[in-house]
Regions:
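NAD-dependent ADP-ribosyltransferases
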Residues: 1-206
Length: 206
């Protein structure tokens, strides 16, 4: 398994390299935009006072990064070839087909949970074996979209942007159009603590 961060830091010669994996950028379209508090919170994750109105300046840019998670990616190409495999990694000399996706995901999730160590996590100061045993694994899988990772706001497009932001998993499944040739299907393995919060992992591969 890779991680969002390992793909972002990969060899630029590999097709899977993507410096902006899991990133979201929101910017205004050269003019100030007035946003209600609820929409502001949906777009940025920042709490606003109930009933507040916020003016987003003409030069506003908000960048956010999805927590680092384990991922497994493959091509949906119905006629896979070695050439497709080598675009991902030049060292690949073979490829295989996944014939039962549900079984593949279930077994991979089982193996991942069995291999987790305290050292796999970013914030290890508060991590204990008891804490480790209380983690749950959420698996989200679907095809990647290729409509980019930037929302450009004007007064007319605010609601459209809010609707897009309500899908918290949109960003780890969003890619730039340049990657569309791969027809990527992605499996995201999200670890959550006892409070349901996503726990970021280190970029190391599994």
């Amino acid at each position: 398994l890779g991680t969002l961060q390992s793909y972002a830091d990969d060899d630029p010669n590999f097709f899977r390299f993507d410096q902006r994996e899991g990133a979201l950028k929101i910017s205004t379209n050269g003019q100030a935009v007035h946003i209600d508090g609820q929409s502001f919170q949906a777009l940025t994750g920042c709490v606003a006072l109930n009933g507040a109105r916020i003016e987003a300046g003409a030069g506003l840019t908000v960048k956010s990064q999805f927590p680092n998670c384990y991922i497994f990616c493959f091509s949906q190409d119905v006629f896979p070839t070695l050439n497709v495999a080598r675009k991902i990694d030049a060292a690949y000399d073979d490829w295989y087909s996944i014939t039962d996706l549900r079984k593949f995901i279930a077994r991979t999730a089982e193996l991942l949970l069995g291999q987790l160590k305290v050292s796999d996590f970013e914030n290890t100061d508060d991590v204990s074996l008891d804490w480790l045993g209380g983690l749950t694994l959420q698996v989200v899988h679907r095809p990647c979209s290729y409509d980019g990772r930037e929302l450009v706001l004007d007064q007319e497009s605010i609601q459209q942007a809010v609707n897009a932001s309500e899908d918290m998993f949109r960003w780890p499944f969003s890619k730039e159009l340049a990657h569309s040739e791969f027809q990527e299907y992605r499996i995201l393995f999200v670890l959550r603590d006892a409070q349901g919060q996503i726990v970021p992992v280190k970029k190391n591969l599994k």
